C-alpha cells in the first residue's frame, strides 16, 4: 500500500502530479516505461471489489486544487469556499486531511518537492477532535 516501504518517493506529490510525472516519463523513451493501462485505469484504493476513487472523491484536479489551498496556501474553510468550491466538498476534504494526520506520522521519510510538506512544516494536533474548519 501507500504506507509500505522505507522511503516514499511520491510522499509530497499530489495525485494529479503523479499522472503528469508518469506521462512525462513515458515521453522520454521511444517505448513507454509505464504501461498506458496503468495511467488510464480508474484509480482505486482497492479496499473492496469494483471500488473506484471517483465513487467517493471529486476528480483529482478539483481535489488537488482544494488540497493546495488548504495545505500549501494555509487557507481556511471559508476562504476556500470563497474561491468557488462547494461548501460540502470543502468540508469533506478538510475532514479527510485532518482525520488522516496520524497516518502521516507513521509514514516513511520521503522527498520534499512542494512549498510546504507534511512533517516539520505542517504539524497539527491529533486529539480532542481538533479541526481548522470554522
Q: How would you name each of these model-derived features?
A:
Residues 1-134:
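ATP/NTP-dependent adenylation/nucleotidyl-transfer catalytic domains that generate, transfer
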